[in-house]
Structure formats: structure tokens, C-alpha cells
Amino acid sequence: RKQLIPFGLYEVRGFISANLAAETGFDQEDLRILFEAIHNMYEHDHSASKGEMSVVSPLILFRHVGTDTDERQRIRQAKLGCAPAHKLFELVKVAKKPGVEVPRSYRDYDAAIDLKHIPEGVEVGFQTYAGIAWGKLPEDENWFHEA
């Protein structure tokens, strides 16, 4: 007999090293293809054991841009990172909604991001199926909201 977990919500965190990207030639087109692959990774992979899995939009992106007025120094800052990753991830909160005992949908969760506390030198973007919206939540996405 197959075991079945009727519903699960997974949070996935990924990182791209600016230094390694420069060494390997990883560029904006590679990034676009990666985001497209993430959005579609379950569309052609349904099975009896996994049921129906999907990626819920938007992907939340943090981009280090630096703060210095000197362009060379700003690029250096951006490559090193302007804030620790764990501090950026702490800005995103996902919690089961009050009154929901057994969640059966991602809509049974409240998802929020604290846009007021994005560190200086960091930009936040939201990758939807339509593209990336930088600095604000996309109007066509209603699951995430500003904390």
C-alpha cells in the first residue's frame, strides 16, 4: 500500500553566488531560464505517489546592489552581499491561518513580507509567471501581502 500525505507546503531557499556566477559565465539569461524551470518543475511530473504538486507564485528574490556612491565600490559591495541571507529570509513569514485545523491548500496559510525593513543596498523582487516586479508586490498576486 502506498502512503499518502494529503497536503504539504514547502518553502525552498536558493542562493546564487555572484563570484561563482562570474567564474562560470552564469548570466541574466541563465537566471531567467532557472526561474522559468522553477515555476514549471512540477507541470510534467505528476504521479500517483506525488499527486498534484505545484509552485505557487511569486518567487521572492533578493538582489544585492550596494550603497556606495563610487560604482566600483558599489559593485564590490553587491558581490559580497549587503545583508546576511538569514536576515533577508526572516522578512518572509508564512503561517497557518487562525481557525484552520487541517490545511488543504496554500490559501490556508497567511504569507507576508516585511517590505519596510529591507536592508539598505538590497532590492526585493517578486517573480511571477509574467515577469519580475521590483520593490512592490505584484498587483495580480493576492496570496502574499505586505506585513
Please identify what each model-predicted range represents:
Residues R1-A147:
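Basic polyanion-binding and macromolecular-assembly surfaces
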